[in-house]
């Protein structure tokens, strides 16, 4: 019996009558309940199905089993019996065997041509390049199923006679020749001295083909992978690739601004037996040598056609997750610091719930908000919250956590199923779609650098997922959903979740999940990758559980910072030769217990780092949740301040008040209903919180704003801000919201062209400029957003109200506590109008009769005006018609040659004398 088998069935039959048959054996088991105890099993004679001899043998434990089959018959008071004794010895197998060649996976092949390891199959081959230096074998044994009383199952593994049990494998040097090398692996156990398992591994050599790729442009990105193993092929120090005969390699050649090419290269022999490399379209002959061969492959990329609809110069005020190339959320805008100085301006529900129909986190492009919800992408007005443009996406996102990213006139959104879709930033029309072959949730922030987009996906706690690099070029303007191929990808167990990359010109840093369930495994990593190839340059391994923060760079300390879900704050530097150095960490705390998780991307400034930390219960209020301040120089926690909910996202720091007060202000959202916006005040050397609110007897970080009613919900959104000090955010109410510095007053900084009206006319705002003056001193033209009476004017409209309607509510301090939901008064200003019969001849309502009024009548008659004119003001002739004769009279009046308009003269009877007549064409102006 192989040691993987343990189910024993017995059949027995006898031709005699009245004979009973029994199987008798001592049981083997992991516990004392059964182990060593005799068991008797009745065997029905001649049964068609066998009877299970349970616990005669153990799975994956080679302890032998002996069973006695006893036939018993009673006759005349005498018992007769016959015993048949059977011993079950075990043959031994390996649990698993895998191989790597020079760090890349090497596939084991059975004699029947199938791939992979099967314990009962004893002969394998593996094909490697003749140029390979080492083959590493990973060998595992059965260790889990010990019998009661055993300390160890007792397996030993030898490779060519050397015991490698403790190491779990061996590195086999390769001799650099074409000759096959043979390795013998044996598995032994003292409980089965005659059952030793012997495996034979034949290492076959494939002479390498040295491939030189010459590309145009020369800096195009080439990505090669072995189709069978999935392992990326990287060039040697001379820039050449060593490919093996009989192998196939997928490739992608990409460059920002060019059309990508992709396909499969196969190293094979043609019908004449010559060694060639082919991609199915082109064949490249190999110059063979004793050591393999060489070939040069020349590939030229075509420049992508220009898409004139894309404006690459559209500005962005907040282009991506943290609004900066460093991922450090530091700004200098004048954000509100006191509750009474701010207000919620608007809350627009664009989505539903908090999963695939949720509203996405926003960015700011060309003065507008770009976000998405469900399968729609939106451009939203920052002042009113009204949707300006709406367009369709290919499909929905997973949880709409990741904000879009803007670059070069395009917006990119991560969608479910490992998808990224590109849109025209102005029109929101689709440009292209990328779909990752491993799929996954799109929970990582997107980052664009030098024309390439970087992001990661997540499938499960233990599943593989990719981190990808994409050229952002619209390669085919004629297609709106062309399929984008990746410039490169890097696969990691556990994938990438909320882990955004820091991307420099010559390296990038990104964290991984730990690949295990829960958040205690010490197996996550910080990867240092080549941004052009995805090559792993260095890594920091064995980190504390999932890395679910973006990596931040702080120029002041020339270091990179991130946090872990296991409760650790990390710092590292990168050397000039792209290696990680000066690594250190700080264990986080919540003062209560449990794991002080952090998925918060640090904001770092002036030697201080600010992060959100979880309490003992992630969704339990006031259970130790806090904002933690790290003293970077001292490498310790300076202090922490409690919050109601876990500040699970990232802070926004403003330096706007530092010169005046020496303080910075840092803003975080609680991820717990109602989703409070809190602000921390801090300065260098501070060791205790000094800007707080009392909540239920607890001292918490200052509650600047509290959503109420339908707007109150959990909040997984890092705040962003514009130049006016307005913070934009979303929460699980599926609403996009704007909170900012309150409007202190409205000012009419330019009077409308018309301020005098006859009763019955309607107000014309042409020429008027209304300016909002904010509490932080900023000013803004809000003319397009104000409201006023649109009904006909009457005598009571001399003081004409202009108001700004987009205000809702705010918090208000009540001692050390905070009152939420306080209604914000609508800002308004009064415009003085003259409303009455009107000044005859004052057509434009500016209080004067002059040439401009005459010109307005001429424009009206020529149908060059979009508005109606007041008959009372314009019909100066009194004939009931507005025409050029009225314009002539106005010109005469303005020149002083006409004292009174005919329409103003007393009505005459038919017998009265005639008035002066003006000949047609005579303006009444002085002649030259």
Model regions and ranges:
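Extracytoplasmic/lumenal domain signature
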Residues: 307-359, 363-401, 405-742
């Amino acid at each position: 019996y192989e040691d993987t088998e343990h189910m024993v069935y017995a059949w027995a039959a006898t031709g005699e009558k009245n004979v009973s048959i029994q199987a008798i054996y001592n049981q083997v088991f992991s516990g004392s309940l059964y182990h060593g105890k005799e068991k008797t099993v009745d065997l029905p004679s001649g049964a068609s199905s066998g009877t299970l001899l349970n616990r005669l043998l153990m799975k994956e434990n080679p302890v032998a089993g002996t069973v006695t089959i006893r036939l018993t018959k009673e006759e005349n008071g005498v018992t007769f019996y016959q015993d048949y004794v059977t011993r079950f010895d075990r043959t031994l197998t390996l649990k698993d065997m895998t191989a790597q060649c020079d760090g890349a996976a090497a596939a084991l092949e059975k004699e029947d041509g199938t791939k992979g390891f099967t314990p009962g199959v004893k002969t394998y081959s593996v094909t490697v390049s003749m140029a390979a230096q080492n083959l590493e074998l990973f060998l595992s044994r059965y260790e889990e199923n010990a019998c009661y009383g055993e300390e160890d199952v007792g397996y030993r593994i030898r490779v060519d006679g050397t015991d490698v049990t403790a190491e779990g494998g061996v590195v086999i040097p390769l001799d650099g020749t074409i000759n096959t090398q043979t390795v013998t692996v044996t598995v032994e156990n003292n409980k089965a001295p005659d059952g030793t398992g012997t495996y034979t591994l034949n290492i076959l050599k494939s002479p390498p083909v040295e491939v030189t790729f010459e590309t145009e442009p020369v800096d195009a990105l080439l990505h090669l992978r072995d189709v069978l193993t999935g392992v990326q092929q990287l060039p040697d120090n001379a820039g050449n690739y060593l490919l093996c005969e009989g192998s196939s390699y997928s490739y992608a050649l990409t460059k920002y601004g060019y059309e990508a090419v992709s396909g499969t290269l196969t190293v094979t022999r043609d019908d004449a037996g010559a060694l060639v490399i082919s991609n199915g379209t082109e064949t490249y002959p190999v110059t063979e040598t004793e050591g393999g061969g060489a070939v040069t492959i020349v590939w030229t990329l075509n420049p992508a056609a220009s898409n004139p609809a894309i404006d690459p110069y559209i500005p962005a005020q907040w282009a991506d997750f943290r609004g900066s190339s460093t991922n450090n959320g530091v700004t200098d805008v004048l954000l509100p610091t006191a509750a009474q100085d701010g207000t919620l301006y608007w809350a627009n529900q664009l989505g539903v719930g908090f999963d695939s129909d949720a509203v996405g986190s926003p960015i700011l492009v060309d003065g507008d908000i770009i976000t998405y919800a469900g399968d729609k992408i939106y451009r939203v007005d920052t002042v009113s919250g009204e949707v300006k443009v709406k367009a369709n996406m290919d499909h929905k996102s997973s949880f709409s956590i990741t904000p879009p990213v803007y670059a070069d006139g395009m917006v990119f959104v991560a969608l479910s199923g490992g998808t990224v879709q590109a849109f025209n930033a102005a029109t929101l029309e689709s440009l292209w779609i990328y779909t990752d072959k491993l799929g996954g949730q799109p929970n990582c922030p997107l980052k664009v650098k030098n024309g390439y987009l970087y992001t990661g996906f997540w499938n499960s706690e233990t599943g593989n997922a990719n981190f990808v690099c994409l050229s952002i070029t619209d390669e085919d303007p004629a297609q709106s959903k062309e399929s984008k191929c990746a410039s490169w990808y890097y696969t990691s167990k556990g994938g990438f979740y909320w882990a955004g990359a820091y991307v420099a010109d010559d390296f990038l840093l990104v964290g991984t999940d730990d690949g295990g369930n829960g958040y205690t495994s010490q197996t996550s990593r910080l990867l240092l990758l080549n941004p052009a190839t995805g090559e792993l340059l260095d890594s920091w391994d064995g980190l504390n559980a999932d890395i679910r923060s973006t990596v931040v760079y702080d120029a002041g300390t020339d270091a990179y910072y991130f946090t872990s879900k296991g409760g650790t704050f990390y710092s590292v530097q990168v050397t000039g030769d792209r290696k990680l150095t000066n690594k250190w960490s700080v264990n986080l705390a919540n003062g209560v217990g449990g794991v002080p998780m952090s998925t918060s991307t640090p904001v770092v400034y002036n030697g201080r780092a600010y992060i959100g930390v979880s309490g003992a219960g992630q969704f339990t209020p006031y259970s130790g949740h806090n904002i933690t301040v790290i003293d970077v120089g001292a490498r310790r926690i300076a202090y922490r301040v409690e919050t109601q909910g876990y500040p699970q996202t990232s802070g926004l720091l403003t330096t706007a008040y530092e010169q005046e007060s020496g303080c910075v202000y840092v803003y975080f959202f609680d991820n717990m209903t109602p989703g409070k916006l809190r602000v921390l005040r801090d300065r260098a050397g501070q060791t205790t919180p000094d800007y707080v609110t009392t909540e239920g007897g607890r001292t918490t970080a200052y509650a600047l704003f509290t959503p109420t009613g339908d707007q109150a919900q959990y909040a997984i959104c890092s705040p962003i801000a514009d130049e006016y000090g307005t913070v934009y955010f979303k929460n699980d109410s599926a609403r996009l919201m704007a909170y900012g510095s309150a409007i202190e007053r409205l000012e009419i900084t330019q009077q409308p062209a018309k301020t005098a009206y006859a009763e019955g006319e309607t107000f014309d705002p042409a020429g008027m400029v209304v300016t909002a003056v904010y509490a932080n001193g900023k000013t803004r033209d809000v003319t397009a957003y104000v409201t006023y009476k649109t009904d006909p004017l009457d005598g009571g409209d001399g003081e004409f109200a202009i108001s700004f309607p987009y205000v809702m509510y705010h918090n208000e301090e009540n001692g050390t506590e905070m009152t939420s939901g306080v209604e914000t008064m609508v800002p308004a200003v009064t415009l003085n109008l003259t409303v009455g019969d009107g000044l005859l001849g004052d057509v434009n309502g500016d209080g004067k009769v002059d040439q401009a009024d005459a010109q307005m009548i001429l424009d009206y008659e020529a149908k060059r005006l979009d508005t109606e004119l007041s008959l009372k003001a314009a019909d100066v002739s009194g004939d009931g018609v507005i025409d050029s004769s009225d314009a002539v009279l106005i010109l005469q009046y303005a020149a002083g040659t006409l004292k009174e308009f005919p329409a103003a003269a007393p009505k005459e009877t038919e017998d009265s004398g005639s008035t002066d007549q003006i000949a047609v064409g005579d303006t009444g102006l002085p002649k030259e």
